[in-house]
């Protein structure tokens, strides 16, 4: 069987289990001629267990208007906000600290995001997460010194 020709790649961040044909999902998929209802049903079924999180999805659209999608891990920023128990990061992160996480929480988040991080091991992944935390005004406790 010949490979299908790819006509589009759509990246979206949608609440898990709550995709609807309303914007932003409908217009993004409609522009590529994808069956929106079919996608929303498939996405909601695939993300049902992760309700409450935002789950990024990469949708590959083919020439015959069929599609497949790959789920990513939730954004590091959202996982950090949940771990710190806060609503949003700081507007001026290097002056106002809005919360704190421990190094172990950074390692836990790095383990969750392992396949999407560009790191060789969990320690390096945790360092990436810690950097994200600092840029959001979240203090990292017990972090190893460089």
Curated annotation (Swiss-Prot):
Briefly state the modifications made to the protein after translation.
One or more lysine residues are methylated.
Q: Which GO terms describe its biological process?
A: translation
Q: Which Pfam families match?
A: Ribosomal_L11, Ribosomal_L11_N
What SMART domains does the database record attribute to this sequence? Answer: RL11 (SM00649)
UniProt KW rRNA-binding keyword: yes
The Swiss-Prot or TrEMBL record annotates one GO molecular function as: large ribosomal subunit rRNA binding
Origin superkingdom? Bacteria
Q: What GO CC terms are in its UniProt record?
A: cytosolic large ribosomal subunit
Q: Which UniProt keywords apply?
A: Methylation, Ribonucleoprotein, Ribosomal protein, RNA-binding, rRNA-binding
Report the HAMAP family cross-referenced here.
Answer: Ribosomal_uL11
Self-association and partners? Part of the ribosomal stalk of the 50S ribosomal subunit. Interacts with L10 and the large rRNA to form the base of the stalk. L10 forms an elongated spine to which L12 dimers bind in a sequential fashion forming a multimeric L10(L12)X complex.
For this chain, the family text in UniProt reads: Belongs to the universal ribosomal protein uL11 family.
**Which NCBIfam families does this one have?**
L11_bact
Q: What is this protein called?
A: Large ribosomal subunit protein uL11
Organism of derivation? Corynebacterium jeikeium (strain K411)
Which lineage ranks, top first, belong to the organism behind this chain? Answer: Bacteria, Bacillati, Actinomycetota, Actinomycetes, Mycobacteriales
